[in-house]
From Swiss-Prot:
It catalyses: an R-cob(III)alamin(out) + ATP + H2O = an R-cob(III)alamin(in) + ADP + phosphate + H(+). ATP binds at G421, N422, T423, G424, T425, G426, K427, T428. This is Lysosomal cobalamin transporter ABCD4. It is found in: Endoplasmic reticulum membrane; Lysosome membrane. GO terms for biological process: cellular response to leukemia inhibitory factor; cobalamin metabolic process; cobalamin transport. It comes from Mus musculus (Mouse). It is an enzyme of class 7 (translocase). Lysosomal membrane protein that transports cobalamin (Vitamin B12) from the lysosomal lumen to the cytosol in an ATP-dependent manner. Targeted by LMBRD1 lysosomal chaperone from the endoplasmic reticulum to the lysosomal membrane. Then forms a complex with lysosomal chaperone LMBRD1 and cytosolic MMACHC to transport cobalamin across the lysosomal membrane.
Length: 606
């Protein structure tokens, strides 16, 4: 096989199972890499704040029973002191609750940062992003999973964190208090009530997780459709394709909305279960209190003392039930968290797997050249051979159809190669193999020169421009960013822009370092984009330039001028093209005839 073919999209249905737990734990390792990490410190701070908050809440909860006492005894001084205490506790509780929410928000930001950067590290390693987006189809919308799903996952998880971490402490304490007030009957009844509620809600949550994963996939597909129209607005306009694209976009919208309706229908039953257990809990608390009262346990108390006791015991039982119902109420949020856990975990597993495979060829990966250095002296001894191919065969992806069979080739310095052939004969496929994006079915491919300045540089068929200034487009993919005041490299960049026929572009952009708010693809014509790619090529000055129809939008005169400048800069070309005018800049021509056959001949210049 030339490349790993697209994997069938047939994964197991996302469920509340061991796989979910494993994926969740793997994500938590990203959040909490060590005991000394910042997130652990914030988590422990949140735990302390919530513990203090619960202590204050307990004292606030006892205030009503104390009011019964002072009002029943008509104690004015006690009433004033109790009111002052109540106001103080309420202000303290409000402050602690605000710090609770603030810390949760900080955790959300920190978690999102750590998880996104972790996925970015895996996604941009070697050419994982290419494999995931082009050669595999089992992971839908990786961009949505990294940008949107991670955000929602971290926000939802942070919103329930304080409730989850305090639950073991509150449940233990209020269970003990409930036992002291009602005996074993109260805790047993409440725990049994919670177990039943948990089992019912787990049954109701299962279908929601599956449907949520499906909804997020369709959300990504719908967003991608709009992005497709945005990127290709001009071709669509030339085709007068508004009506058909309207229909296709609405079709994706209807699929999304239908899934959302199904999700809401399943959530309806979960909401019914949650609300039912909420209201039943309030009745259960009084049933638990009533049993010892009617059985005569408190028969020796006066009405005022009994009211005080009932108020205190009611608070304890109601709060214990409230702790359980809060956990049940989190079912909807936790089902969302489970759905996002599956989507993010699935992506993380795929990225980790591909990253491990890429480590074996890391020396041939993105570390091939220093992205931080400007063009200068090569760090290794220059090689007079760029590529060495020995009996290489290439297949089309997911096909047994051979594109090229048993190709042996040596591309040396000063011996430029022109690759020609009809559409579909494997010209670009050969460049993908040379660049390491694809693997040959058999044979060996060696790249003996480094990537980058004084090595090999590829100009793909579709020009690529990132966001940023004009300078950043020219020096791309070098990472060094110059100050706004300019640099010693300004003259070189301007000169290469002039040589590429883009002398007016500096004025149009307002300078090399002027931030622009446009999309470069929207403001540059196809010819200008190819000229800007050549300005980048001139700036980086590789020894070998691999060009995939890099002048197809230019005239023959402009094409000849750009190739002539490249020759003057000492470049050896490996070009894909159709024009006979290209032959004078090359020493050899490789003609691909399709079906695997090819012909390599030396160009005889007149």
């Amino acid at each position: 096989m030339a490349v790993p073919g697209p994997t069938a999209r047939a994964g197991a249905r996302p469920r509340l199972d061991l796989q979910l737990v494993q994926r969740f734990v793997r994500i938590q390792k990203v959040f909490f890499p060590s005991w000394s990490s910042q997130n652990v410190l914030m988590f422990m701070t949140l735990l302390c704040v919530t513990l203090l908050e619960q202590l204050v809440i307990y004292q606030v909860g006892l205030i009503p029973s104390q009011y019964y006492g002072v009002l029943g005894n008509k104690d004015l001084d006690g009433f004033k002191a109790l009111t002052l205490l109540a106001v103080t506790l309420i202000v303290l509780n409000s402050t602690l609750k605000s710090f609770d929410q603030f810390t949760c928000n900080l955790l959300y930001v920190s978690w999102r940062k750590d998880l996104t950067e972790h996925l970015h590290h895996l996604y941009f390693r070697a050419r994982v992003y290419y494999t995931l987006n082009v050669l595999r189809d089992d992971i839908d919308n990786p961009d949505q999973r990294i940008s949107q799903d991670v955000e929602r996952f971290c926000r939802q998880l942070s919103s329930v964190t304080s409730k989850l971490i305090i639950s073991p402490f509150t449940l233990t304490y209020y269970t003990y208090q409930c036992f002291q007030s009602t005996g074993w009957l109260g805790p047993v009844s409440i725990f049994g009530y919670f177990i039943v509620g948990t089992m019912v809600n787990k049954t109701l949550m299962g279908p929601i997780v599956t449907k949520l994963v499906q909804q997020e996939k369709l959300e990504g597909d719908f967003r991608f459709k709009h992005m497709q129209i945005r990127v290709n607005a001009e071709p669509a306009a030339f085709y007068r394709a508004g009506l058909v694209e309207h229909m296709r976009t609405d079709r994706r919208l209807q699929r999304l909305l239908q899934t959302q309706r199904e999700l809401m229908s399943r959530e309806l039953w979960l909401y019914i279960g949650i609300n039912t257990f909420d209201y039943l809990g309030s009745i259960l608390s009084y049933v638990v209190i009533a049993i010892p009262i009617f059985s005569g346990v408190y028969g020796d108390l006066s009405p005022t003392e009994l009211s005080t006791l009932v108020s205190k015991n009611a608070f304890v039982c109601i709060y214990l039930i409230s702790c359980f119902t809060q956990l049940i109420d989190l079912s909807t949020t936790l089902s969302d968290v489970a759905g996002y856990t599956h989507r993010i975990g699935e992506l993380q597993e795929a990225l980790l797997d591909m990253s491990r495979k890429s480590q074996d060829c890391e020396a041939l990966g993105e570390s091939e050249w220093d992205l931080d250095k400007t063009p200068g002296c090569p760090t290794t001894e220059p090689s007079d051979t760029a590529f060495l191919l020995d009996r290489v065969s290439i297949l089309a992806p997911s096909s047994d159809k051979p594109l090229i069979k048993d190709l042996s080739l040596k591309i040396c310095e000063g011996q430029s190669l022109l690759i020609t052939g009809n559409t579909g004969t494997g010209k670009t496929s050969l460049l993908r193999v040379l660049g390491g994006l694809w693997e040959g079915m058999k044979g060996s491919v060696q790249m003996l020169a480094d990537f980058g300045p004084h090595g090999v540089l590829f100009l793909p068929q579709k020009p690529f421009f990132t966001d940023g200034t004009l300078r950043e487009q020219v020096i791309y993919p070098l990472k060094e960013i110059y100050p706004d005041s300019g640099s010693a490299d300004d003259e070189r960049i301007v000169r290469f822009l002039e040589l590429a026929g883009l002398s007016s572009l500096v004025a149009r952009t307002g300078g090399l370092d002027q931030q622009v708010d446009w999309n470069w693809y929207d403001v540059l014509s196809p010819g200008e984009m190819q000229r800007l790619s050549f300005a980048r090529l001139f700036y980086l000055q590789p020894k070998y330039a691999v060009l995939d129809e890099a002048t197809s939008a230019l005239t023959e005169e402009a094409e000849s001028e750009l190739y002539r400048i490249g020759q003057q800069l000492g470049m050896t070309f490996i070009s894909v093209g159709h024009r006979p005018s290209l032959e004078k800049f090359h020493s050899w021509v490789l003609r691909l005839h399709g079906g695997g056959s090819w012909e390599l001949t030396r160009i005889k210049l007149e």
